[in-house]
Amino acid sequence: MKKFENVAMYEGNPKWENAISRNEKLYDPVYGDAPMRTEFDRDYTRIINCNAYRRLKHKTQVFFAPKNDHICTRIEHVNLVDSISNTIANFLGLNSELTSAIAVTHDIGHSPFGHQGESILSEIAQREYGDKFWHGSNGLHLIDDLELLSDLAGVKRNLNLTYAVRDGIPGHCGNPNPNGQKPREEFVDLKEFTFSNKFAPYTWEACVVKIADNISYLGRDLELSLIHI
């Protein structure tokens, strides 16, 4: 048995019902529940078809205004995180569909110009509104309030992702715990997740993505600095 199979986020896990919960029912009952896809596979498809995901291709990871075609973009970064987290999840026996959905979603709220752009926007928000800009909160705002997809009746609705995938957006922010990254037990309102590492991620799969995020950007950023700049 793979070491983490007993805590993987599948049906039977004590957290399962919370993990797959959505803000509202996904489909009108007249159309059925589209059983050919899992809950997290639906989320993955919703994300890669939304405009916020598409815009990641125009946002560079670290260096801006580059003259080099091989500078890493956000969309490349999330795909690398998807690949790394998928490898780790499969090795440990975790739910790789969940890690993939979290991976492609985790940076959905990032500003242009990387963390420097985030800092500038935060300064403006603090000065003008007494608030701050943080890509973790902005990602939740995008998928919960701004991004729309047509349902089976042609009505535009927000993405309405599962709790476990939404949790991975603020949950990936900040460095992993150096003493070991473990998920939290509490089912918290994600709107209360207002800064990095306020809460641990809710699932082991989100912990894997948090670590994969660090693996991805540390190696790629170093490569960019040494070879492409």
Task: List the predicted regions and their residue ranges.
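An N-terminal structural lobe/cap that precedes and organizes the functional/catalytic core
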Residues: K2-K156, I169-H172, N177, D189
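Histidine/acidic-rich helix-loop-helix segments that form or flank divalent-metal centers
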Residues: S137-S216, R220
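Conserved small/polar residues in nucleotide/adenosyl-binding loops
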Residues: I227-I229
